[in-house]
Amino acid sequence: MKKEVVVVATMTAAATVVVAAVLLRQWKRKKQRQWRETQKILRKFARDCSTPVPKLWQVSNALVSDMKACLASSGTITTLNMLVSYVSPLPTGDEKGFYYGVNLRGTNFLILCARLGGKNNPISDLHKEEIPIPSNLMAATSKELFDFIAVELGKFVSEHPNTLAEELSKLGCIVSCPVEQSVVSDGTAIKWKSFSADSKVGKKLVSDFNKALEEHGVKLRVYAMVDDTVGNLAGGRYYNRESVAAVTLAMGTDAAYVEPANAALQWHGPSPKLGDMVISTQWGGFSSPHLPITIFDTCLDAESPNPGCRRFEKLISGMYLGEIVRRVLLKMAQETAVFGDTVPLKLMTPYQLSSPDMAAMHQDTSEDHKIVGEKLKKVFGITSTSPKAREVVSEVCDIVAERGARLSGAGILGIIKKLGRIENKKSVVTVEGTGALFLAASQMQMQNDDPDPDPEPGNDDDDEEPDIDDAHPDNDDHDHEHGNDVRDPNLN
């Protein structure tokens, strides 16, 4: 009897081992299938996001075509809604004096002041203060908003007075929204981001702002109001006369550039003194069949507040990069269990992943992707990840970041090509910056001086393309070989 029991126990143990081995093999095969599916999703996403040089040229050329069509007539239908900015002349670098600036952003505004020393002299006495806008003012009238800003400006000026001030000091003003103008000294906000009050759209902002300043006894007057990208171009031109464009790559995106006045039929006022003007391209709205749009981009666009609009912006701006990554990771989690058998709840929350967190994962070059693991835990509550899973997340971030960077480069290349400056002319492109001070200074200089006009920038319509490799937007040697430069005033 004992012998039979031993035999049965042995057979049972053997069967258990066999079953365990079978289950283990099945589990391994399942994991292998899931991993292959993960890789399949990753490879397809990489292919759909690919930006080979010929495609970048197609994007650049399409942008140039839309720019030309938009400038030809205000009634021409294009994906761009370019706006003439009546800033003329731009700073020359010779401006001197003490100036104030204000940058009206989405949820806050920045006040700053500084003394400009002219050529070869550093900026001095720089002071700045960032002030949050109370939530109740987001839906208030423009009068209430400007009253609040005027009071804060009054406090700032009392702390940092212009001791050599005239009766009224000049104030440069930048707003983070498109501004349609007939003169630089006034502007109409087309859409003011983050604000819901209808009264701020279509209002003459400068006159409202100056009225608030006067009512509160603040000895400042707004002499120029432009959008933030045009302001950045003004800042770049102060440092380098070869600055021909400025690009904003933040939560939103835009590009502004210097265009000969005779190329823009939308100019409704007197011709500028220096024969050129600043154009705000509003390139966030640019769209083309050549853009590498994936199923994730299509779904994001369909679920956005403005479906079918701002397609270029949704590929390159900080508002959307993290969300694109989240959507790819969600598909992997749902179909391949890359983060385990249960899909993390936070991974299903739209816009849970911010672009700064996505950028941190993109920049994680450690062997075990430690930062990626930390961000997955912090953002999505994923407490345990394998090295392979973290590597996949890193690759998704890389793909999205690279596509955005290369498309941005293609856009910049398109502007330089539109100006006919690719081959032989030095071109400086300013990225970000704080242009309000320089804007105020340039308008002051315009009143005091009549500078000698500069030659108009070249604007030949020769569409002959240089060698593709030499003009590669990601080629580090290109800027030096052809004299093109990208700089950031770094004043924020």
Predicted regions and their residues:
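Acidic active-site catalytic centers that drive phospho-/nucleotidyl reactions
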Residues: 103-105, 228, 454, 463
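Conserved beta-strand elements of beta-rich interaction domains across eukaryotes
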Residues: 105-109, 116-119, 136, 176-180, ...
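Glycine-rich phosphate-binding loop and adjoining helix at the ATP-binding site
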Residues: 130-150, 154, 174-237, 242-245, ...
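Generic beta-strand structural signal
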Residues: 169-171, 243-245, 253
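Condensing-enzyme catalytic core mediating Claisen C-C bond formation in acyl metabolism
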Residues: 292-295
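Asp/Glu-rich intrinsically disordered low-complexity tracts
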Residues: 449-492
